[in-house]
Amino acid sequence: MDPYKYRPSSAYNTPFCTTNSGAPIWNNTAVMSVGERGPILLEDYQLIEKIATFTRERIPERVVHARGASAKGFFEVTHDVSDLSCADFLRAPGVQTPVIVRFSTVIHERVSPETVRDPRGFAVKFYTREGNFDLVGNNFPVFFVRDAMQFPDVIRAFKPNPKSHLQESWRFLDFCSYHPESLLSFAWFYDDVGIPINYRHMEGFGVQAYSLINKAGKARLVKFHWKPTCGVKSMLEEEAIRVGGSNHSHATQDLYESIAAGNFPEWRLYIQTIDYEDQNNYDFEPLDTTIAWPEDVVPLRPVGRLVLNKNIDNFFAENEMLAFSMSLVPGIHYSDDKMLQARSFAYADTQRHRLGPNYLQLPVNAPKCPHHNNHHEGFMNFMHRDEEVNYFPSRYDACRHAEKYPMPPNVLSGKRERCVIPKENHNFKQAGDRYRSWAPDRQERFVNRFVEALSDSKVTHEVRNIWISYWTQADRSLGQKIASRMNARPNM
């Protein structure tokens, strides 16, 4: 469907305003009343329609990633990866695919400043010839918890206090004190990269492990990495306070104005891959979202480039109604990553809540390739259909099964149970390695930020001691520094 054909504001270039039903309006500045000073008439359909439309303009904001900005462009394959995936949009170097990208903060509300310390979202929708592929990630390569059952809780812990609506560090420090696997995420969160200078200078990571399948049916685990060609840049607290105090939409403005000026943001896509049969040969768990795949063990491989060269035409239509739902295409599949599998339900479900069951009919979300199924009717269904057969199979309809494409061939066995990921030996190691890789001044800023969080008056001695113990296990000198600032003794 061509979205521009149905725009009531300019589709037919009418010289005057009309009602939603198309009737001409001869006075759009005064209500219908009994005389000049009399009461308004209930029959003033024009007023009722105008007010009713206004009071319904807002839709539910996203439960996470509410604050965001979008832009359009293309993805181009630059390196041959046909040995890894049979995905059509990755078939050969030079192939271009239209995309729309949404950047966001994670925790804060729709109108919050873009200078807050918060993970950033980096979501890409590829409009491929075989359907849409949604690659939804963050600017950190890891997450705070490894099991999907804990996802709602960690988000609530970072959200404002439900009683006061104040965001308080004691809440997420309390929750994450039960999760030492969160250390590496905190080593990103309280690092300098915790406040990107804008969206153009921000990395992106798929976080979870997906699966790539080639034409021969060989499957590999894969992680995706977006690297900005203009480099990674961040803001320190003083600059964030100054910038946020004068412009709470600085990153959105920077993205929009850069594209308008022809300074198109660009990222390079890299992947890491692990053969399915080699998953258990590493000392880390490849399906654990709280750890990173070491690049010296699993090297990066270049794939392509992402260029954003067009601003969106309407913020509501192409940002607020833009919906990512973990869509897949042949050649790319989910892995057994517990967080990824839960997200495959959560993303689509929250879009049904925000936008209705037919959210994929909205122009920004609809595939650009031919598509057909028997998903009929429902709220806000605006697709015109005149077929008589809405079931499958039928001898009156030529629709048939598509050609079979390869799927991950893993064979599963085990008993039904609730259990934890067994390999937890990297809870502390990678966080310590990251801390030790920083220059002394960067280490000092990290210590100051974490000590400030621990200094919340509602953080108990027990929680403080737990965190000092965690950081001591990551790096003894780091634990000692935090303990010294808190007038406590580090315990192993």
Swiss-Prot record:
Keyword annotations of the record: Heme, Hydrogen peroxide, Iron, Metal-binding, Oxidoreductase, Peroxidase, Peroxisome
Names of required cofactors: heme
Catalysed conversion reaction: 2 H2O2 = O2 + 2 H2O
Tissue: High levels in green cotyledons, mature leaf, stem and green hypocotyl.
Keyword set includes Iron: yes
PROSITE patterns: CATALASE_1, CATALASE_2, CATALASE_3
One example of a Gene Ontology biological process annotation: hydrogen peroxide catabolic process
EC number: 1.11.1.6
Main location class: other
Active site: 65, 138
Record carries keyword Transmembrane helix: no
Localization per Swiss-Prot or TrEMBL: Peroxisome
Residues involved in heme binding: 347
Single GO term (MF): metal ion binding
A cellular component term, taken from the record's GO annotations: peroxisome
Assembly mode: Homotetramer.
Matching PANTHER family: CATALASE
Functional description taken from the UniProt entry: Occurs in almost all aerobically respiring organisms and serves to protect cells from the toxic effects of hydrogen peroxide.
Family label: Belongs to the catalase family.
Name recorded for this polypeptide: Catalase isozyme 2
Organism encoding this protein: Cucurbita pepo (Vegetable marrow)
